[in-house]
Amino acid sequence: MTFQNKKILVAGLGGTGISMIAYLRKNGAEVAAYDAELKAERVAQIGKMFDGLVFYTGRLKDALDNGFDILALSPGISERQPDIEAFKQNGGRVLGDIELLADIVNRRGDKVIAITGSNGKTTVTSLVGYLCIKCGLDTVIAGNIGTPVLEAELQREGKKADVWVLELSSFQLENTESLRPTAATVMNISEDHLDRYDDLLDYAHTKAEIFRGDGVQVLNADDVFCRAMKRAGREVKRFSLEHEADFWLERGTGCLKQGNEDLISTQDIPLQGLHNAANVMAAVALCEAVGLPREALLEHVKTFQGLPHRVEKIGEKNGVVFIDDSKGTNVGATAAAIAGLQNPLFVILGGMGKGQDFTPLRDALKDKAKGVFLIGVDAPQIRRDLDGCGLNLTDCVTLEEAVQTAYAQAEAGDIVLLSPACASFDMFKGYAHRSEVFIEAFKAL
């Protein structure tokens, strides 16, 4: 892909947008920048990084009317809007940073492991990256997990990697056509981002774009949407918590198996919860697909300590355990967290619901939860969806109040679980900030 003499508008000026500007400028493009709202301080900050950069704000259509060949979109901006559809119909091209990286790795021959899913993708990405590094591969971990892929590429100054381990969101896959992963997985599909997609099937179709090419497909055999993503003529590895598969959990023994072969006991895996058994199986399958030896992978799994804010025990007071799952930002993630914990629960839910249906939590909560505490802007909707199923629902103004009230009701042996099933931006700077407030509230008890 050549950018010489191409006029490109980069839309969205967060980390991904900045990395696209830097990469495209380095490769000879004439680049301008757009954001719907731009403060003078932000313009000055970015202007110091890129001399002579032209900025546009306001209506995207007005910016696009300036003769651009390509629109480079940050993931937060949907291309499903009339201005962008008209741009494409008039011959304009729309792409994102993953498409730009795909062009690089396709030419250079780098291997790629690509990971998406409604839940678990960050844990699996981190675990796969950890295993690749431990096995001696020159590994780049990037994408939705934090480091924009083009920022990572620029830092490497064009050096080929043994493997790129990419966490990809559905937003990033919307305008990615050329990525051909060596191995890829969709961990699961549950309600998320339905404010952006027509329905759950539309969302699942977007996730399935990760399987372009002829690489190994790693599929969740327990998920009806994932099972349907199998493509003809491809090598497929399936994992299951429910029944025998290529990789599966033998419930009676707590052993992960490959066919009839014992792999590792769940007692030897530091990650808590059944959902993490699925994460481990997917990670091992992905790593084997790029040629890493199983024996070494299983030994390194035993030393992976997981990620903060994901079903993480933060402390205990008078026998009451407090667990942080602030990264549980949708119904599926929260249901998985609840399913993986055995003790009676007091669960804190709420925030920005993103158009989700919370009724699936009724079954997840009814046999385990002694109480549910609701916070945030969509607390009323969660109450409506859970009402009448026998749960004790309590509205709280703040997260601190929810922690205090839950602790007051809990007994030794109970768990207070923060797993909101919602985004955090109505009350917090992000899920990490929400976690910090939860931890401080626990310490203040």
From Swiss-Prot:
InterPro entries: Mur-like_cat_sf, Mur_ligase_C, Mur_ligase_C_dom_sf, Mur_ligase_cen, MurD. GO terms for biological process: cell division; cell wall organization; peptidoglycan biosynthetic process; regulation of cell shape. GO terms for cellular component: cytoplasm. It is an enzyme of class 6 (ligase). ATP binds at G117, S118, N119, G120, K121, T122, T123. GO terms for molecular function: ATP binding; UDP-N-acetylmuramoylalanine-D-glutamate ligase activity. Its EC number is 6.3.2.9. Keywords: ATP-binding, Cell cycle, Cell division, Cell shape, Cell wall biogenesis/degradation, Cytoplasm, Ligase, Nucleotide-binding, Peptidoglycan synthesis. Pathway: Cell wall biogenesis; peptidoglycan biosynthesis. It catalyses: UDP-N-acetyl-alpha-D-muramoyl-L-alanine + D-glutamate + ATP = UDP-N-acetyl-alpha-D-muramoyl-L-alanyl-D-glutamate + ADP + phosphate + H(+). It is found in: Cytoplasm. Its main location: cytoplasm. Cell wall formation. Catalyzes the addition of glutamate to the nucleotide precursor UDP-N-acetylmuramoyl-L-alanine (UMA). Belongs to the MurCDEF family. This is UDP-N-acetylmuramoylalanine--D-glutamate ligase. It comes from Neisseria gonorrhoeae (strain ATCC 700825 / FA 1090).
